[in-house]
A protein has these predicted regions:
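A transmembrane-helix-recognition feature enriched in membrane-embedded lipid enzymes
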Residues: 1-11
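Flexible, glycine/small-residue-enriched loop-and-beta-strand segment within the central core
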Residues: 14-26, 31-100, 116, 123, ...
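C-terminal/domain-terminus segments
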Residues: 101-115, 121-122
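Acidic/histidine-enriched, glycine/proline-rich intrinsically disordered or flexible terminal extensions
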Residues: 139-152
Length: 152
């Protein structure tokens, strides 16, 4: 039996059921759902006001090469992963190491953003592998204008 299996997840200020590793930079006003993995071991920056939905995984390292070479190549690959301000990461979405997601973007539920992907701001990304479906810039502008008008 694994002696650490019965230990609780390391405490974090976001969600008792989220696993946050390494030392990620997480911006002010972020919400992180239960059963998420936030891997800061290879460098991770999450901007202000992001929502990371339940079950999402954001990773900044990989042991693929180490595993496949039977540890002949005994390294853990690490790469900075960046998520811009005010991004929404959907339920069970996966963001792999080295990906850059521009501000005000949505990663749809179940999407997989591949290593080194560069997602422009205001993008809606869906699918496996994740692809930009369309721009959300006009939608965000309209929603903001409607919200401002409703407050008058």
């Amino acid at each position: 039996m694994n002696p650490t299996a019965a230990q609780p997840l390391p405490p974090n200020p976001y969600n008792a059921h989220a696993w946050i590793t390494g030392d990620p930079e997480i911006g002010e006003g972020c919400w992180i759902g239960a059963f998420t993995l936030i891997d800061g071991q290879g460098g991770l920056k999450i901007g202000r006001g992001c929502n990371i939905s339940c079950g999402a995984q954001i990773v900044s390292h990989s042991t693929v090469r180490r595993c496949l070479t039977e540890r002949v190549l005994d390294v853990v690959d690490k790469r900075l992963t960046e998520i811009g301000d005010h991004c929404f990461i959907g339920t069970n979405a996966v963001v792999l190491m080295g990906a850059r997601i521009g501000h005000h973007s949505v990663i749809a539920a179940g999407a997989v953003v591949l290593e080194k992907a560069d997602i422009p701001p205001y993008s809606l990304v869906a699918g496996v592998p994740g692809r930009v479906v369309r721009s959300l810039e006009a939608d965000v502008e309209r929603w903001s204008a409607e919200a401002r008008a409703a407050k008058l």
